[in-house]
């Protein structure tokens, strides 16, 4: 199973006024809705998207990653982005990859965010 946790700096989005927060989440949600991923809002405002085991969640989560890593607005306002994977073995613990830290190192869009 794969999961992806995303958190935006919602306070800064509102303060800056460049984008509408609802529109940002609508775009992000759309990346996961196509494959019926399960969306869970966390207490801290982050959103956990979990793959639907009855759909091709591998493609879904990979396409979401590939799309979001190219979005300047996402790079600017994302403050948590973690990919969880247990290699489809429910007996294994999830490994997590701090995607945001990696993108800040490797992706010029995220370098100055």
Where are the predicted features?
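Short hydrophobic/aromatic-rich motifs at helix boundaries and adjacent loops
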Residues: 1-2, 36
